[in-house]
Amino acid sequence: MAGHSKWANIQHRKGRQDAKRGKIFTKLIKEITVSARMGGGDVNFNPRLRAAVAEAKEQNMPAENIIRAIKRGTGELEGVNYEEIRYEGYGINGAALIIDCLTDNKQRAVADVRHVLSKHGGNLGTDGCVAFMFKHCGVLVFEPGTSEDQVMEAALEAGAEDVITDEDGSIEVITAPGDFTAVKEALEAAGLKPVLAEVTMKPDNETVFSGEDGVKMQKLLDALEDLDDVQEVYTTAVIEE
């Protein structure tokens, strides 16, 4: 990826997320509800719920919205029963895609995903066709200029799997999904605030898209992320400005 700045890509991605703040609340409500349903309503014993609640607080979601979502998940309040579904497929030039949905209508979800992929030059694949190209892990990114030694010491002591310093000076901390929240809290307690922190599907290899192909791929990703049932989209594609 010669000439490609990972830091620039992260900033671009954060900008896109901020522009879709309205949908972020909807996604987080769904995630909190499903997390509570699957693992219980106590954040101390449910790492997935703990991470979702922490993200909701960072996005300034009102506390009563968070509490209601947890209660819907535990059954204390009536709510929609969302099902988790993962679709795999391909985008422009065969770029791998993983599309995670939370939906109350599986038929609608798959029809919408298939339609967007077909419309934008991609196609839906079979289960497992691209998942092997990604690693399920926690990722925390620190901006260039952050002390590598401080991050390394705090992260590894808290149980992180790896600390990677990129050519542009940004630092990535990789964790097991179950250790993500503990590592994030340990780093923040040490005064180290990540600019991006998420449990994600991290591609083993990335392909840089630029020019017309980059524009097409970005349109495809945006269209998928705009679907109501879609929670997350992971790809091997990196869009270069």
Curated annotation (Swiss-Prot):
Cellular component GO terms held in the UniProt record: cytosol
Compartment annotation: Cytoplasm
Domain of life: Bacteria
GO MF annotation terms: DNA binding
GO biological process: regulation of DNA-templated transcription
Keyword terms: Cytoplasm, DNA-binding, Transcription, Transcription regulation
Family, similarity comment: Belongs to the TACO1 family.
NCBIfam families associated with the record: PRK00110.1, PRK12378.1, YebC/PmpR family DNA-binding transcriptional regulator
PANTHER family cross-referenced by the UniProt entry: TRANSCRIPTIONAL REGULATORY PROTEIN YEBC-RELATED, TRANSLATIONAL ACTIVATOR OF CYTOCHROME C OXIDASE 1
The protein's name: Probable transcriptional regulatory protein Mfla_2355
